[in-house]
């Protein structure tokens, strides 16, 4: 019934989570050792992001989250995102929030961040 479906779609949360994903999330939150390691990794890697940004004259918005927001003022942030995607690295442009120079970048493992830094360094040099 289209009317009932429409009503249910208006009532549901914007991001549906199935029961398996919900159980996995609860289990992950109970794994305090994993959480501790993840928080430590994010903290250390966030410092590396800050150093990379400083070395490349980019502004990183202060954060305590599992991602950083980097201001690529003077560059075409969307073009950077596209070039990263072409290399298999996904970042999120914040154009929808009227932040055309900002990319949201998830903090990964050190090896993942190393790869991002290397690829991004080459892209920035190409775009100068």
Q: Which ranges hold each PLM region?
A:
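PLP-dependent aminotransferase class I/II
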Residues: 1-54, 58-61
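A generic structural signal for alpha-helix starts
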Residues: 3, 33, 75-76, 111
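Phosphate- and divalent-cation-binding pockets in alpha/beta enzyme and binding domains
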Residues: 7, 24, 71, 79, ...
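Structured loop/turn residues at secondary-structure junctions
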Residues: 13, 72-73, 108
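Short loop/turn and capping residues at structural boundaries
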Residues: 19, 64-65, 95
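A short, structure-level motif marking secondary-structure boundaries and short turns
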Residues: 33-36, 64-67, 109
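Conserved PLP-binding catalytic core of the aspartate aminotransferase-like
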Residues: 43, 55-87, 103
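PLP-dependent enzyme catalytic core of the Aspartate aminotransferase-like
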Residues: 83-87, 92, 96-128
């Amino acid at each position: 019934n289209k009317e009932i479906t429409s009503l249910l779609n208006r009532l549901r949360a914007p991001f549906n989570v199935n029961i398996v994903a919900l159980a996995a999330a609860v289990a992950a939150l109970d794994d305090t050792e994993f959480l501790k390691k993840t928080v430590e990794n994010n903290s250390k890697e966030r410092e590396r992001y800050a150093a990379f940004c400083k070395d490349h004259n980019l502004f990183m918005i202060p954060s305590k989250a599992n991602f950083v927001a980097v201001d690529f003022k003077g560059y075409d942030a969307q073009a950077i995102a596209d070039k990263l995607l072409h290399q298999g690295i996904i970042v999120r442009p914040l154009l929808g929030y009227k932040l055309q120079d900002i990319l949201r970048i998830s903090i990964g493992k050190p090896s993942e961040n190393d790869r991002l830094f290397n690829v991004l360094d080459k892209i920035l040099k190409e775009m100068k």
